[in-house]
């Protein structure tokens, strides 16, 4: 009996010692908070796994609910890694715009190292002068071969020319499907049409809708968003990288195939490159590489491998977001036929049928613009920005944020915040129309989909123009529908860009 009591006391003392040691390690690992500041609040997480179970399959929803309790600045753990979560339009603008230099970093996540061998402009951890110079170069190239006017074309700019051509081909492909099976999955055809636009801008060429290499690449692209979406456990718990993981293996395969495809395209451009005759973005990057003109003051040069990475970033950003936006738009059109009719009435009144829509028509089509804004807001198909990280010790709203802290920016929460939106769960384009029939500029600027500040998507303007032009050309010519009684599944599938379930029951007819 005495022996048992002695053992129980020993066990109790040992357990107490372990508890105190663990408590001390946790306290010691937390950064010292400067006087006058405090640590961000947040719920207690499980040992080892943190809040993974709480995040579930829809982290944007879980973290939005959490923000209602803990506020717009809160902290969770994924595994043992602390993650700052930002919600609320004012808070996010404060962090990414007013304090942009503090929050412009990228965390060195495992999945990010697999993109462009860790040298991606969008996903890589660099945020210094080299990154800034590459970003400026990419922006200039994108502007030169999309927004700039083409003297040999009647279109207002290169982008308008490319989109107009691809929209006409897309309509023809959909007509073929109606003449055959009598229905179609629009995503299958939209994705190639949009990919062809960015291919024309980057490589000066387009591909047939049955081009097998391009088809295999774009069909794998969904896996990309699934892995790099905010909250992927393998990014925070190293052991998960070594367990069987179909998504992660597919992600590695996709990045290798994309990289190989880009290398092949750039090698072909080098063979046919002619100084003074710049055909596309790739040619312009080669010219900068040869003349070492990326940033003369900093003496920064662009290597051949960096060209591959820049083009890869532009290609990825230029097709996935636009494809997803158009695909969601079509889903909203068939589930809201009243809205579709109203857009077409506006097109008929402003443009008619004798000419195709142009980018210059955009400011005269407020209901079309309101529909696109409401599609962006309601779907919020980019629920989080690509994760940020802090570049130095800083503070936000009275909370201390140490250097190197991973930061999730919840765009979905902004777009569904009841403080900003009346009945946010309702799809209502009219919310963006003022009493005099114009777009409400103040309200439209509250829709956040492309990030803010120094890491804002460089292709935002072009993406908005492209979505507008594709939809305007399609809806001027075509009416979309699904058969009576067919249920359209609008449930988002979580990822970096959230897709909807495939709908094979789309139908279309040319407008009389």
Swiss-Prot record:
Protein's recorded name: Cytochrome P450 1A1
Q: Which reaction(s) are listed as its catalytic activity?
A: an organic molecule + reduced [NADPH--hemoprotein reductase] + O2 = an alcohol + oxidized [NADPH--hemoprotein reductase] + H2O + H(+); estrone + reduced [NADPH--hemoprotein reductase] + O2 = 2-hydroxyestrone + oxidized [NADPH--hemoprotein reductase] + H2O + H(+); estrone + reduced [NADPH--hemoprotein reductase] + O2 = 4-hydroxyestrone + oxidized [NADPH--hemoprotein reductase] + H2O + H(+); estrone + reduced [NADPH--hemoprotein reductase] + O2 = 6alpha-hydroxyestrone + oxidized [NADPH--hemoprotein reductase] + H2O + H(+)
> Which cofactors is this protein said to need?
heme
> What organism is listed for this UniProt entry?
Macaca fascicularis (Crab-eating macaque)
Spell out the subcellular localization from the entry: Endoplasmic reticulum membrane; Mitochondrion inner membrane; Microsome membrane; Cytoplasm
Cysteines joined through disulfide linkages: none
Record Pfam families = p450
What is the membrane topology listed in the Swiss-Prot or TrEMBL record? Peripheral membrane protein
């Amino acid at each position: 009996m005495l022996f048992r009591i002695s053992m129980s006391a020993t066990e109790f003392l040992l357990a107490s010692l372990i508890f105190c040691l663990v408590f001390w390690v946790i306290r010691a690992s937390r950064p010292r908070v400067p006087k006058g500041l405090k640590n961000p609040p947040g719920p207690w997480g499980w040992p080892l796994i943190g809040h993974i179970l709480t995040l579930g399959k829809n982290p944007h929803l879980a973290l939005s609910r959490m923000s209602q309790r803990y506020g717009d600045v809160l902290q969770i753990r994924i595994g043992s890694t602390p993650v700052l979560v930002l919600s609320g339009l004012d808070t996010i603008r404060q962090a990414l715009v007013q304090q942009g230099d503090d929050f412009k970093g990228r965390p060195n996540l495992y999945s990010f190292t697999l993109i462009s061998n860790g040298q991606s402009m969008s996903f890589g951890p660099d945020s210094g002068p080299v990154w800034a110079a590459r970003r400026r170069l990419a922006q200039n190239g994108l502007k030169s071969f999309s927004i700039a006017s083409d003297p040999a074309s009647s279109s207002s700019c290169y982008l308008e020319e490319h989109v107009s051509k691809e929209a006409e081909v897309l309509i023809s492909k959909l007509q073929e499907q109606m003449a055959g099976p009598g229905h179609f999955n629009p995503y299958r055809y939209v994705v190639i049409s949009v990919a062809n636009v960015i291919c024309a801008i980057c490589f000066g060429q387009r591909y047939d809708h049955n081009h097998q290499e391009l088809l295999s690449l774009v069909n794998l692209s969904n896996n990309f968003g699934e892995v790099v979406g905010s909250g992927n456990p393998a990014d925070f718990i190293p052991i998960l990288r070594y367990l069987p993981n179909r998504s992660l293996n597919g992600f590695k395969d996709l990045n290798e195939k994309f990289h190989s495809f880009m290398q092949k395209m750039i090698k072909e451009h080098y063979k046919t490159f002619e100084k003074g005759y710049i055909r596309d973005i790739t040619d312009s990057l080669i010219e900068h590489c040869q003349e070492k003109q990326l940033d003369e003051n900093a003496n920064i040069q662009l290597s051949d491998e960096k060209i591959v990475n820049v083009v890869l970033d532009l290609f990825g950003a230029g097709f996935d977001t636009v494809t997803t936006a158009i695909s969601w738009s079509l889903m909203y059109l068939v589930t809201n036929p009243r809205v579709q009719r109203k857009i077409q009435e506006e097109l008929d009144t402003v443009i008619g049928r004798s000419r195709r829509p142009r980018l210059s028509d955009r400011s005269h089509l407020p209901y079309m613009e309101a529909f696109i804004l409401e599609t962006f807001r309601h779907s919020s198909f980019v629920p989080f920005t690509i994760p940020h990280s802090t570049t130095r010790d800083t503070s936000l709203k009275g909370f201390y944020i140490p250097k190197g802290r991973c930061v999730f920016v919840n765009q979905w929460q902004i777009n569904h915040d009841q403080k900003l939106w009346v009945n946010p769960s309702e799809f209502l384009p009219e919310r963006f129309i003022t009493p005099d029939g114009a777009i409400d500029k103040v309200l439209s600027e509250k829709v956040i989909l492309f990030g803010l500040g120094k890491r804002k998507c460089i292709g935002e303007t072009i993406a908005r123009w492209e979505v507008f032009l594709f939809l305007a050309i399609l809806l001027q010519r075509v009416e979309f529908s699904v058969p009576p009684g067919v249920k359209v599944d609008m449930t988002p599938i979580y990822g970096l860009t959230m897709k909807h379930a495939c709908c094979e029951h789309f139908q279309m007819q040319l407008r009389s």
